[in-house]
């Protein structure tokens, strides 16, 4: 049976990948009186007096909405809300399997920025966090920024930040392998969409100053008159200080790091050969990378990562988002801020001991059960230290709870 046939059969047999199950039984009058009338009035009254108690008495404290408009779904593009639901269901399965979080898929029948923002704001009372998913750039930037300002729960566009966090964790370790200083490296990033912009911002936060971002028109620089948008304009102000113009082939020369979030075969072996010694290549285009790892290695690359599970160093968002939201929910965070993102980077990177670190093992595997608990612990701690936590908890308790909640063996 082909992958297509197997996938279709699995989805049809189960009528999707999710179901709703109660946490309590209702098998007699006493249980009915507690779950519904008259007993249900008691938590209602308590929540009315203190809205924070909604986290204690309802699913809000362990539930995240997975929201899309279906405009930028995986490698499929703008396929609309209905066709995006299987992906949102899949994301919800990962939330539950890796961190015990209830993920609720919501596919919106609008691509209007204001309507999306208004709808998500109206949903805020129900959810402990919002995971934005597969919303096209540059609209995704405004939607996330507005929602972060106008809501009081964590809003996280995983296509941006999940990718950036795992990429950064991999880069931290790859630089240890090649023994290069992050403040002195030259990075060329190909792809100026949601993931690329977020990666550049996180690289800057980690001290990388020599960066050139490319899109389909070549190097982005301040004052470029073509193919720009407000987000690219901002990035251009603090990247490519020398205003280098030209194609990817021209600007990748002497680079220490290539990061691709673009299209298959964008990077050639000759381009790799033109880079600095011991180059690091993260080729994350899906389903096919910018360069095949074996080809990159043959051209001189020292460390190669992709988005695929059939090659070493898989840069997979599942290493980040379950633990990030678990940590945020445990402290009832109001936001996911930069300190929490950095804490997630360090949690992922630190899981690989120096004695284990090598060219083919710079990033933990997606089924390493230590990942989500470690990320959750670090994120909860960072939330408390940075002032966005509503409650104080012991970070080690967060680790232990997440370890018990994960389905991984």
Located regions from the model:
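ADP-ribose/adenylate-binding Rossmann-like module
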Residues: 131-134, 155, 257-311
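Short, acidic/small-residue loops that bind anionic groups at enzyme active sites
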Residues: 150-164, 283-286
């Amino acid at each position: 049976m082909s992958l297509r046939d197997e996938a279709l059969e699995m989805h049809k047999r189960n009528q999707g990948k999710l179901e709703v199950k109660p946490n309590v039984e209702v098998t007699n009058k006493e249980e009915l009186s507690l779950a519904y009338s008259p007993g249900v009035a008691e938590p209602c009254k308590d929540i009315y007096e203190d809205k924070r108690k909604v986290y204690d008495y309802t699913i809000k404290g362990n539930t995240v909405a997975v929201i899309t408009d279906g405009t930028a779904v995986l490698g499929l593009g703008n396929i609309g809300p209905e066709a995006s639901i299987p992906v949102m269901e899949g994301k919800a399965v990962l939330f539950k399997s890796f961190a015990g979080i209830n993920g609720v898929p919501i596919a919106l029948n609008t691509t209007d920025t204001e309507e999306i923002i208004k709808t998500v704001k109206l949903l805020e009372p129900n959810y402990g966090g919002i995971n934005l998913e597969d919303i096209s750039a540059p609209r995704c930037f405004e939607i996330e920024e507005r929602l972060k300002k106008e809501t009081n729960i964590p809003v996280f566009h995983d296509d941006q930040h999940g990718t950036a966090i795992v990429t950064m964790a991999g880069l931290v370790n790859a630089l240890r392998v090649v023994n290069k200083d992050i403040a002195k490296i030259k990075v060329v990033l190909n792809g100026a969409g949601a993931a690329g912009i977020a990666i550049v911002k996180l690289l800057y936060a980690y001290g990388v100053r020599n960066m050139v971002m490319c899109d389909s028109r070549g190097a982005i620089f301040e004052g470029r008159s073509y193919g720009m948008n407000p987000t690219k304009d901002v990035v251009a102000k603090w990247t490519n200080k020398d205003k280098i113009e030209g194609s990817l082939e021209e600007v990748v020369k002497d680079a220490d790091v290539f990061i691709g979030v673009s299209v298959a075969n964008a990077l050639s072996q000759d381009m790799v050969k033109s880079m600095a010694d011991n180059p690091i290549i993260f080729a994350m285009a899906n389903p096919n990378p910018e360069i095949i790892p074996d080809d990159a290695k043959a051209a001189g690359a020292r460390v190669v990562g992709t988005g695929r599970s059939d090659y070493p160093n898989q840069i997979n968002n599942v290493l980040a988002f379950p633990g990030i939201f678990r940590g945020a929910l445990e402290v009832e965070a109001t936001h996911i801020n930069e300190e929490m993102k950095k804490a997630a980077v360090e949690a992922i990177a630190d899981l690989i001991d120096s004695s284990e670190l090598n060219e083919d093992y710079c990033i933990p595997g997606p089924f390493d059960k230590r990942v989500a608990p470690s990320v959750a612990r670090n994120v909860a701690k960072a939330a408390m230290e940075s002032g966005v936590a509503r409650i104080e908890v012991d970070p080690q308790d967060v680790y232990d709870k997440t370890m018990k909640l994960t389905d991984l063996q």
